[in-house]
């Protein structure tokens, strides 16, 4: 019971009003909770004194953010409001990464409320006319997949080697992953 209360208070403590006068409360929630959920995951991990888990959380956050930004620039999909870089939703991928970590590392007691909060982040992005549902779904799937590979699959950057390859007109990347 104490853990659920701590999780709820932590997630919603990041939703206090700031200088977002032109935005709806739902949009402000999405803006803040994209950071609040992963920060809450870090707080829970610290309470558990789980060093390995903290590394998995940090690595998942890094790879999720990097992959999201690479896709945004590469795809450059138009937003519903006419802006660019709609695909995938960065807010949703950030929130979902924290939720996925909590689910895979500590189970449903933490994972379900965190995923519920992440779904609201995704909903806020669609309601704010910033994303289509496909952008939100892709952000959630991307973050969940990356965090699964790290937390459950044991895949880590410490097991990955990337070396650029240049030979005349040929350019490439040598990649090696040990399991």
Cite the ranges covered by each PLM segment:
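Hydrophobic core of alpha-helical transmembrane segments in multi-pass integral membrane proteins
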Residues: 37-45
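Interfacial segments of alpha-helical transmembrane regions
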Residues: 44-63
